[in-house]
Amino acid sequence: MSKIALITGSTRTPRVGTDVAAWVLDVIKSRPEDKLQVEPLSIADFNLPIYDEPVMPAMVPAMKQFTKEHSKKWSEAIQSFQGYVFVIPEYNGSMSGATKNAVDYLYNEWPGKPVAIVSYGTQGGERANKHLSESLELVMKMKVAPTKVTLAFAPGTDVFAAINEGVLGEDTRKAWTEAGHKEKILKAFGEVKEILEQ
């Protein structure tokens, strides 16, 4: 059975990313799946500093050649999956530094694997989604699902709760459902599955 990592890209505290990722995971698991196992993975759990290995990631052909324990653990975790779903915030018009740093830590673990991208933010994180998609497809040589999911918080108190308390509000959950985002997530995940089956 192939394994898919659902990667939470935010590392700040508090962060709503864990709630968003849990919501996405619930959506994916709402459709019975017998060929793919989806597991949550949080970048924050790896405590990655700004890249500090002595060689470029592309020059590390094997995980054992990393010199730092955090690099080895991150490489080993990513290598163990056959595909990915990134759940990322938008910071200042792009992906978060933590997301970019985590992606850039590795190279040989990524190419050829399928990935879907779900972004979120006050306006849905469209630019973060686009920038990560370009990085993964053009540089890391991954196969990016065509369907991109952008989730905007409901206006008012939900925005405050998301940004300042790390809480995903009920109005936002309802708005995402009514806007058809659950269906888009399932479509994007289906595209990941199709790529794996090719």
UniProtKB/Swiss-Prot annotation:
PANTHER family: CHROMATE REDUCTASE, NAD(P)H-DEPENDENT FMN REDUCTASE LOT6
Quaternary assembly: Homodimer.
GO biological process, one term: terpenoid biosynthetic process
Gene Ontology annotations for the cellular component aspect, listed alphabetically: cytosol
SUPFAM superfamilies (alphabetical): Flavoproteins
Alphabetized UniProt keyword annotations: Flavoprotein, FMN, NAD, NADP, Oxidoreductase
Catalyzed reaction equations: FMNH2 + NADP(+) = FMN + NADPH + 2 H(+); FMNH2 + NAD(+) = FMN + NADH + 2 H(+)
Role according to the record: NAD(P)H-dependent FMN reductase; part of the gene cluster that mediates the biosynthesis of the meroterpenoids arthripenoids. The pathway begins with the HR-PKS atnH that catalyzes two chain-extension steps to form a reduced triketide, which then primes the SAT domain in the NR-PKS atnG to initiate three more cycles of extension to give a linear hexaketide corresponding to the polyketide part of arthripenoids.
Gene that encodes the chain: atnL
E.C. designation(s): 1.5.1.39
Pathway the protein acts in: Secondary metabolite biosynthesis; terpenoid biosynthesis
InterPro entries associated with the record: Flavoprotein-like_sf, FMN_Rdtase-like_dom, NAD(P)H-dep_reductase
Protein name: NAD(P)H-dependent FMN reductase atnL
Biological source species: Arthrinium sp
GO molecular function, one term: FMN reductase [NAD(P)H] activity
